[in-house]
């Protein structure tokens, strides 16, 4: 009898799974939405496309499915993906009733950060404490610091050229943005630019961490590695070892900043930690714990480093492979930077129409945060623009990549074309509305002003000061997998000799 019971248990579980699959495919409220049956049955359909055997391919499979099935496809037991521009500004807008999905944001770690906060009231308090810091007026005060980083970085590029070494541009650009954003965050840089090959641990770690999120989402238990003794975990995962190094580095920077702050030694430019250490009772903001400060700062560094580095890298590659674009941009830069070592105010760079067009097109073409950012359908459900009803609690999202490469919004979207941003303003109304690299609404990227300053400064001085030439790099190398951020299939290298005039 006991043996029979043991046999019936697994059989019963199998029957349950079969019944669950039948319900999800044919009787679930989302069963009217087309999509793969495997996606309707299990969220591991996404893992199949993102981890193995396809690696970072779910975004592109969803793109294909939209081509077959139309504006809305089912990509999980309780999730649909929408590719209808009419819906974008409803889903992602100020005052939106759509909440972030707590389960999705557990993947990120840093639970006390603003990015991971799903409660709209708490999110408003936390974001409100930082909004003034990230305002345009505040970011303009960072200009001397940003320019100092560019000067140092430029000298390192020249050193590589003199040593006969082509520069790995992805890591070089991410090293620069790393030192910019960590100085803004911690009051002092991580020193990524000083690494001889631009392969410092922080740069590699943030890149590897973001690329590991597909695995963490599918198999949350892997986060238990962080709780293992260090001497064991380091042999299982190199990322754990780098993570411990980052923890120590961050703790050291935070402790150093707090000690100086308490002794009245404050930086002469705005910093994230400085703002977090300043309570605001009127807005309900209290100074976070040390862990809360670290969560906030590390999340901001992670979000701001790779995306800006990737955008500038993709834009630079496209410019270098299009001589007409390159020559026109260089000629425009020379109008306000007449000498190789000339310096112009950031607000003057912003006024350059062709530079602005190149940066806008880089933001569109790179789509560095390409994937969907899902939300939960609010109580009462919603109707899509085509009239279909989506019940409350459904996870729903739209990918920025599919917006930016929609031919109805951006004609010839696979062509890098700065000219599209130089037409009559009336013609560009739709394009400007749907250029959404920072998302939109209450949850839009808070660092947009900092990112713009970095992009203008990097692009202007890199192209004006250095005679850039590709080294063993083709368009094939710039193809990518969607690993939360793009992971490129090859390496973009360039010669970075200093111009003589």
Swiss-Prot record:
Glycosylation sites noted in the Swiss-Prot or TrEMBL record: 305, 472
Record pathway: Secondary metabolite biosynthesis; terpenoid biosynthesis
Gene3D superfamilies (UniProt xref): Cytochrome P450 (1.10.630.10)
InterPro entries listed in its UniProt record: Cyt_P450 (IPR001128), Cyt_P450_CS (IPR017972), Cyt_P450_E_grp-I (IPR002401), Cyt_P450_sf (IPR036396), Cytochrome_P450_monoxygenase (IPR050121)
Gene Ontology molecular function: heme binding; iron ion binding; monooxygenase activity; oxidoreductase activity, acting on paired donors, with incorporation or reduction of molecular oxygen
Membrane topology: Single-pass membrane protein
Protein task: Cytochrome P450 monooxygenase; part of the gene cluster that mediates the biosynthesis of sesquiterpenyl epoxy-cyclohexenoids (SECs) such as anthrobotrisins and arthrosporols, metabolites that possess a novel hybrid carbon skeleton consisting of a polyketide-derived epoxycyclohexenol combined with a terpenoid-derived monocyclic sesquiterpenol substructure (PKS-PTS hybrid). The SEC pathway plays an important role for fungal soil colonization via decreasing fungal nematode-capturing ability.
Protein name (database record): Cytochrome P450 monooxygenase AOL_s00215g280
Record lineage: Eukaryota, Fungi, Dikarya, Ascomycota, Pezizomycotina
């Amino acid at each position: 009898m006991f043996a029979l019971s043991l046999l019936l248990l697994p059989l019963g579980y199998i029957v349950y799974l079969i019944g669950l699959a039948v319900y999800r495919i044919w009787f679930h409220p989302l069963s009217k939405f087309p999509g793969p049956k495997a996606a309707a049955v299990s969220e591991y359909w996404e893992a199949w496309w993102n981890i193995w055997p396809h690696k970072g391919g779910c975004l592109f499979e969803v793109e294909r499915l939209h081509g077959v099935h139309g504006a809305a496809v089912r990509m999980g037991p309780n999730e649909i993906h929408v590719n209808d521009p009419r819906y974008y500004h409803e889903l992602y807008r100020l005052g939106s009733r759509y909440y972030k999905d707590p389960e999705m944001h557990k993947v990120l770690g840093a639970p006390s950060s603003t990015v991971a906060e799903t409660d709209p009231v708490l999110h408003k308090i936390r974001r409100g404490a930082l909004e003034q810091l990230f305002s345009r007026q505040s970011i303009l005060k960072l200009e001397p610091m940003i320019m100092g980083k560019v000067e140092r970085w430029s000298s390192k590029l020249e050193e590589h050229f003199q040593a006969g070494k082509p520069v790995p541009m992805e890591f070089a650009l991410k090293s620069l943005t790393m030192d910019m954003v960590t100085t803004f965050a911690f009051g002092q840089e991580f020193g990524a630019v000083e690494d001889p090959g631009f392969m410092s641990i922080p740069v590699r770690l943030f890149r590897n961490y973001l690329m590991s999120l597909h695995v963490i989402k599918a198999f949350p238990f892997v986060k238990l590695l962080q709780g293992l003794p260090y001497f064991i975990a380091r042999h299982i995962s190199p990322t754990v070892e780098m993570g411990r190094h980052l923890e120590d580095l961050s703790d050291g920077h935070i402790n150093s900043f707090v000690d100086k702050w308490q002794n009245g030694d404050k930086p002469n430019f705005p910093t994230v930690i400085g703002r977090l250490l300043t309570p605001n009772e009127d807005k309900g903001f209290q100074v976070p714990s040390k862990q809360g400060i670290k969560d906030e700062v590390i999340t901001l560094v992670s979000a701001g480093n790779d995306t800006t580095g990737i955008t500038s890298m993709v834009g630079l590659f496209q410019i270098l492979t299009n001589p007409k674009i390159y020559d026109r941009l260089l000629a425009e830069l020379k109008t306000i930077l007449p000498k190789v070592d000339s310096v112009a105010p950031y607000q003057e760079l912003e006024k350059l129409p062709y530079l602005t067009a190149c940066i806008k097109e880089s933001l569109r073409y790179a789509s560095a945060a390409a994937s969907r950012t899902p939300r939960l359908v609010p109580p009462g459900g919603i109707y899509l623009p085509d009239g279909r009803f989506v019940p409350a609690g459904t996870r729903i999202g739209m990918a920025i990549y599919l917006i930016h490469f929609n031919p109805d919004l951006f004609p010839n979207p696979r062509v890098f074309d700065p000219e599209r941003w130089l037409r009559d303003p009336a013609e560009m109304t739709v394009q400007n509305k749907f250029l959404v690299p920072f998302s939109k609404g209450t949850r839009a990227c808070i660092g947009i002003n900092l990112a713009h300053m970095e992009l203008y400064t990097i692009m202007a001085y890199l192209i004006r000061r250095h005679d850039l030439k590709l080294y063993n790099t083709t368009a094939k190398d710039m193809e990518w997998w969607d690993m939360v951020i793009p992971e490129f299939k090859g390496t973009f290298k360039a010669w970075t000799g200093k111009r003589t005039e």
